[in-house]
Every structure is written in C-alpha cells, then in structure tokens.
C-alpha cells in the first residue's frame, strides 16, 4: 500500500471516528432521560468502544504504517508516541464522559429527592385524612 492510499484510509477512519464519537456523546446525553437510561447507556458503550477501536487499530496503526513507509532505513520506535496519543484521546474523551455522568448523577439525585418529597406529602395527606375520619367518627359517637 503506498503512502497516499494509507493517508486516505486514515482520513476516512478519522471522519468515521469523529462521527462515532458524536453518536456516542449523543447517546450519553440521551441517557439523561431517566426512563431510557439503560438503553442509551448500552448504545453509548457500544459507540465508545467502536470509537476506541477505530482510534487504536485504524488511525494509530495507519499513522505508524505511514511513518514506516517513509522510513526505509530502520523501523521507528513508536511506543512513546502511541502512549502519549492514546492518553490524550482517552483523557479528553473521559473528561467529556465524566462531565455528562456528573450531570446525569445530579438529575438522578434531584429526581430521587422529588420522589421522596412526593412520598412524604402523600403520607402526610393520608395521615391527615385518617385523623379527620377518626375525628368525625368520634363526633358521631358523642352525638
């Protein structure tokens, strides 16, 4: 495979990786909807795994193949480049994920607080209703 076709293949994979990351983040954002959280989280996991594999297997490997095709003399040591690039991509993606998970956690906590308040209100109303009924029955017994 010549250098130009390697670069074209890398370009296609970068576009696919960006689209996959966008779909992954869209699924993560959609998971903020309490009712469809599990379904959207599984979509997010699938898309983020696909993104990681594209970056690691296609883009990084393609760049290494390209560099190797340009250096005919000796193989180039890519280990430090790969680790740095993987760390940067992982760090940036993880930062975005954590931000969304924090938002999701806040929404879940607010929803739980709301449900707890509604439950307490309902219990209070039922208690008041029972007290009124008891009071009315006492009044009827007095008469």
Swiss-Prot record:
<keyword id="KW-0175">Coiled coil</keyword>
<protein>
    <recommendedName>
        <fullName>Putative mediator of RNA polymerase II transcription subunit 11</fullName>
    </recommendedName>
</protein>
<keyword id="KW-0010">Activator</keyword>
<dbReference type="GO" id="GO:0006357">
    <property type="term" value="P:regulation of transcription by RNA polymerase II"/>
</dbReference>
<keyword id="KW-0805">Transcription regulation</keyword>
<keyword id="KW-0804">Transcription</keyword>
<keyword id="KW-0217">Developmental protein</keyword>
<dbReference type="GO" id="GO:0003712">
    <property type="term" value="F:transcription coregulator activity"/>
</dbReference>
<feature type="compositionally biased region" description="Basic and acidic residues">
    <location>
        <begin position="111"/>
        <end position="136"/>
    </location>
</feature>
<dbReference type="GO" id="GO:0016592">
    <property type="term" value="C:mediator complex"/>
</dbReference>
<dbReference type="InterPro" id="IPR019404">
    <property type="entry name" value="Mediator_Med11"/>
</dbReference>
<dbReference type="GO" id="GO:0070847">
    <property type="term" value="C:core mediator complex"/>
</dbReference>
<feature type="coiled-coil region">
    <location>
        <begin position="97"/>
        <end position="143"/>
    </location>
</feature>
<comment type="function">
    <text>Component of the Mediator complex, a coactivator involved in the regulated transcription of nearly all RNA polymerase II-dependent genes. Mediator functions as a bridge to convey information from gene-specific regulatory proteins to the basal RNA polymerase II transcription machinery. Mediator is recruited to promoters by direct interactions with regulatory proteins and serves as a scaffold for the assembly of a functional pre-initiation complex with RNA polymerase II and the general transcription factors.</text>
</comment>
<dbReference type="GO" id="GO:0001097">
    <property type="term" value="F:TFIIH-class transcription factor complex binding"/>
</dbReference>
<dbReference type="Pfam" id="PF10280">
    <property type="entry name" value="Med11"/>
</dbReference>
<comment type="subunit">
    <text>Component of the Mediator complex.</text>
</comment>
<comment type="similarity">
    <text>Belongs to the Mediator complex subunit 11 family.</text>
</comment>
<dbReference type="GO" id="GO:0006366">
    <property type="term" value="P:transcription by RNA polymerase II"/>
</dbReference>
<keyword id="KW-0539">Nucleus</keyword>
<feature type="region of interest" description="Disordered">
    <location>
        <begin position="109"/>
        <end position="143"/>
    </location>
</feature>
């Amino acid at each position: 495979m010549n250098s130009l076709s390697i670069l074209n293949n890398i370009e296609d994979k970068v576009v696919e990786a960006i689209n996959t990351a966008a779909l992954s983040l869209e699924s993560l954002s959609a998971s903020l909807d309490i009712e469809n959280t599990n379904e959207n989280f599984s979509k997010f996991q699938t898309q983020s795994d696909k993104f990681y594999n594209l970056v690691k297997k296609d883009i990084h490997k393609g760049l290494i193949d390209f560099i190797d095709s340009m250096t005919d003399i000796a193989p180039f040591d890519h280990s430090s480049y790969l680790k740095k690039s993987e760390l940067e991509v992982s760090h940036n993606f993880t930062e975005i994920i954590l931000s969304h998970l924090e938002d999701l956690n806040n929404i879940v906590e607010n929803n739980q607080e709301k449900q707890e308040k509604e439950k307490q209100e309902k219990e209070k109303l039922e208690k008041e209703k029972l007290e009124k009924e008891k009071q009315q029955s006492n009044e009827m017994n007095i008469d």
